[in-house]
């Protein structure tokens, strides 16, 4: 279940920047950037470090999102996994284990950071205290959950030239998951079939 924890999961702005502590202004700025992408596709690289900075895992793959609440996250071999949501439930398929886990999608943004990119962004101010800084074409956000029942203590989200660039999730013991997005494309037509999953024959199914 490592991918669900990390997905439902940071570049720093260089040069002169202006910091904003007004939560309402930060919400408005973040909402405006997220609203630009009704669909999004990207390649990604993901690096997880422990509290001392030791590498725990490094992966790469392809991401597709469609608002509201649809996403597909495919991690390449040798740690291949496929994570899909149709907005109501989530499938996590591990071809090496020949196993798929099916869960109800937790709509709370603090439990599923991926919903920041694909879900109901009107709930952002309910879930997070937000600050941001802006310099040149870079906008960096820091999101702190307002409740303690969360997968992370801090979420950092950065945009460059209006496109999402990277995400960092830091948990209570200092473990960091850094996700860098590249080849980002927005508002292209996406086949709805990629956001559903047909269980292959012979695969074990676990309902949670």
UniProtKB/Swiss-Prot annotation:
Q: Which GO terms describe its biological process?
A: lipoprotein localization to outer membrane; lipoprotein transport
Q: What does this protein do?
A: Participates in the translocation of lipoproteins from the inner membrane to the outer membrane. Only forms a complex with a lipoprotein if the residue after the N-terminal Cys is not an aspartate (The Asp acts as a targeting signal to indicate that the lipoprotein should stay in the inner membrane).
State any GO CC term. outer membrane-bounded periplasmic space
- This protein's species is Pseudomonas paraeruginosa (strain DSM 24068 / PA7) (Pseudomonas aeruginosa (strain PA7))
Keyword terms of this UniProt record: Chaperone, Periplasm, Protein transport, Signal, Transport
Q: Does the keyword Transport apply?
A: yes
Q: Where in the cell is it found?
A: Periplasm
HAMAP family, alphabetically? LolA (MF_00240)
Principal cellular location given in the protein's record: periplasm
Indicate what this protein is called per its UniProt record: Outer-membrane lipoprotein carrier protein
> Which is one Pfam family of this protein?
LolA
What's the family? Belongs to the LolA family.
Q: Where is the signal peptide?
A: 1-21
Quote the NCBIfam families the UniProt record gives.
lolA (TIGR00547)
- Subunit relationships: Monomer.
Concerning PANTHER family, the annotation shows: OUTER-MEMBRANE LIPOPROTEIN CARRIER PROTEIN
